């Protein structure tokens, strides 16, 4: 996957967080959400990444310089939507003209390297111009629905407000993460129109352009439905932390770590444990700590 690249959208203010810091730096298990995304992209084997910064850009750029110095940044001065954000990285894209690009929001901490790899394999084997990562959920309200044609290819992504009663019953939703052939994406970006109440340029409309021009568009349905999850306020951030906390504790207990009561136990997913370790209530372990037997 050496020839691949990725773009992380991280320009948004996240007003409901009521923070003076970029939303993507809000932490899930002691690690900024964008760092979870970067770690998964790196584990998947993607070596060249560009982060689109915007709100409080200097704070995010300083964090990236210290923690991921190889990551490139481009600033979106006017925040006019996700497709507009991607267009800010046009020079980055042109350097990867004959490659594929993975595009994702920086506030989706549960994206995992397995989903990235498998969606790329599907993207290549199906010879797609664009591949949407989708997930099937019990409550799809608020998400764009994946509408497929009789050949099971993506026919449209329909937003909640535009969905008919029959489309609203569809449980397969758009995660907001995509693979694109770079050359095709560069051609599509200027054709996206701000045909919405916000007068903004949205990346899902690139899918509409691709479909209208006869390019192959498909969706890779992940079994990890948590990849869709993000946080727009501190209540949702708390929910993400609890999901992540429970996953870590479950994996530790299945690996032999004794946690007789999980009350107040918060452990970083980078921590490691020796054999026969017992963790008592109220224990907090941060970072890549190593607890020996």
Give, region by region, the residue ranges found by the protein language model.
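Catalytic metal- and UDP-sugar-binding loop of GT-A-like glycosyltransferases, i.e.
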Residues: 9, 28, 104
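Conserved core of the sugar-phosphate nucleotidyltransferase
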Residues: 111-197
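Short, high-confidence coil segments that cap the C-terminus of an alpha-helix
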Residues: 46, 98, 127-130, 215
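A short, conserved beta-strand element in the Rossmann-like catalytic core
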Residues: 16, 109-110
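N-terminal nucleotide-binding beta1-loop-alpha1 segment
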Residues: 1-19
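Short aromatic/basic micro-patch
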Residues: 27, 110, 179, 230-231
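Conserved N-terminal catalytic core of the sugar/cofactor nucleotidyltransferase
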Residues: 1-5, 32-104, 110-114, 121
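Left-handed beta-helix
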Residues: 198-293
């Amino acid at each position: 996957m050496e020839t691949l690249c990725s773009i992380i959208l991280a320009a948004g203010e996240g007003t409901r967080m009521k923070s003076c810091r970029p939303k993507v730096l809000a932490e899930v298990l002691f690690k900024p959400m964008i760092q979870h995304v970067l770690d998964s992209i790196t584990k998947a084997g993607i070596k060249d990444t560009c982060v689109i910064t915007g709100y409080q850009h200097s704070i995010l750029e300083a964090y990236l310089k210290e923690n991921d110095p190889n990551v490139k940044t481009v600033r979106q001065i006017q925040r006019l939507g996700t497709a507009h954000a991607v267009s800010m990285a046009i020079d980055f894209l042109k350097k990867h003209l004959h490659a594929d690009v993975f595009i994702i929001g920086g506030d989706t901490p549960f994206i995992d390297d397995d989903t990235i790899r498998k969606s790329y394999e599907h993207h290549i084997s199906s010879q797609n111009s664009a591949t949407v990562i989708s997930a099937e959920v019990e409550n799809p309200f608020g998400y764009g629905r994946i509408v497929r044609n009789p050949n099971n290819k993506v026919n449209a992504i329909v937003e909640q407000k535009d969905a008919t009663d029959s489309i609203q019953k569809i449980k397969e939703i758009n995660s907001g993460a995509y693979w694109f052939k770079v050359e095709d994406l560069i051609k599509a970006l200027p054709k996206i129109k701000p045909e919405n109440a916000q007068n903004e340029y949205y990346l899902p409309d690139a899918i509409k352009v691709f479909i209208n021009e006869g390019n192959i568009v498909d969706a890779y349905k992940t079994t990890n439905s948590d990849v869709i999850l993000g946080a727009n306020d501190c209540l949702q951030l708390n929910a993400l932390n609890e999901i992540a906390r429970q996953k870590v504790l479950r994996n530790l207990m299945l690996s032999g770590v004794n946690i007789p009561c999980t009350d107040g136990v918060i452990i970083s997913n980078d921590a490691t444990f020796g054999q026969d370790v017992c963790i008592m209530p109220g224990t907090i372990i941060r970072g890549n700590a190593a607890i020996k037997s």
